[in-house]
């Protein structure tokens, strides 16, 4: 099956899996396909993972129920990260690029009732992705450090790779990807969407498939992570400059969507 069609079908499958369990506002692709780093061959097959924004009920708010924030693992080991709109929008404000990327992906499903607000959200994505540049830079460097710590850690999901290569090649490729990303975002001031696709993606795919031996992989991982940290240190300013317009946009969209949903719920009760 052609790549684009395959991804579309898997994203729709995720939506269909949760649509009867939650009031889904927006479900979007996350991960390697958004970076052009997905692989489908006899040696490696990339999962299709998604994030979903869901809406609470009026009753959830009144009774102060814990907002939903969970990960669903499907039978094929693909993941759906499900988060209440309040939780997801706070993650956007925290500038974690793993969350921000869902505003830029070409693969998504929307709730047509809220189409206007979702389009407004996606059209405002670049502003939201630079809501707090210092925090975004810290997140990128932090992600690189997390991947370095995970490089040789025998997690249940990666222990086979550790035993085979002496390290997890996927973690190394993430470290290299973060270095490419932080330089485009912070030094070259490129648009966020353009930062998602690394310049050396063919090389990163080979890295992910285990190109390097353990010694070279360890050395490169440590050096590149250190470079990413140094870039962050050089770019972060003394004070965080907050893009209040981006915050206002997120708050406005959240308000409009929840107002519309609760109004509909209450009218249906009567």
Question: Each predicted region: which residue ranges?
Answer:
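N-terminal regions immediately upstream of nucleotidyltransferase
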Residues: 1-10, 228-235
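Generic structural signal for hydrophobic core residues of well-folded globular domains
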Residues: 54, 92, 179-186, 261
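Active-site nucleotide-donor binding segment shared across nucleotidyl transfer reactions
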Residues: 14-65
């Amino acid at each position: 099956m052609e790549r684009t069609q395959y991804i579309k079908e898997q994203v729709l499958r995720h939506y269909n899996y949760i649509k009867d369990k939650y009031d889904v506002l927006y479900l979007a692709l996350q991960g390697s396909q958004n970076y052009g780093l997905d692989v489908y061959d006899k040696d490696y097959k990339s999962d299709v993972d998604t994030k979903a924004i869901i809406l609470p009920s009026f009753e959830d708010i009144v009774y102060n129920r814990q907002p939903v924030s969970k990960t669903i693992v499907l039978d094929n080991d693909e993941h759906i990260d499900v988060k209440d709109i309040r939780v997801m929008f706070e993650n956007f404000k925290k500038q974690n690029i793993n969350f921000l990327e869902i505003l830029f992906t070409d693969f998504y499903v929307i709730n047509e009732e809220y189409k206007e607000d979702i389009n407004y959200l996606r059209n405002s994505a670049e502003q939201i992705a630079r809501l707090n540049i210092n925090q975004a830079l810290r997140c990128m460097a932090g992600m690189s450090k997390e991947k370095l710590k995970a490089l040789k850690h025998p997690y249940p999901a990666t222990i086979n790779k550790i035993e085979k290569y002496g390290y997890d090649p996927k973690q190394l490729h993430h470290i290299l990807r973060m270095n490419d990303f932080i330089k485009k975002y912070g030094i070259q001031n490129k648009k966020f969407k353009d930062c998602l696709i690394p310049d050396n993606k063919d090389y990163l795919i080979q890295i992910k498939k285990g190109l390097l031996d353990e010694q070279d992989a360890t050395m490169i991982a440590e050096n590149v992570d250190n470079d990413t940290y140094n870039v962050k240190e050089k770019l972060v300013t003394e004070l965080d400059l907050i893009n209040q317009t981006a915050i206002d946009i997120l708050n406005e969209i959240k308000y409009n969507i929840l107002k519309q949903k609760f109004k509909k719920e209450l009218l249906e009760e009567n």
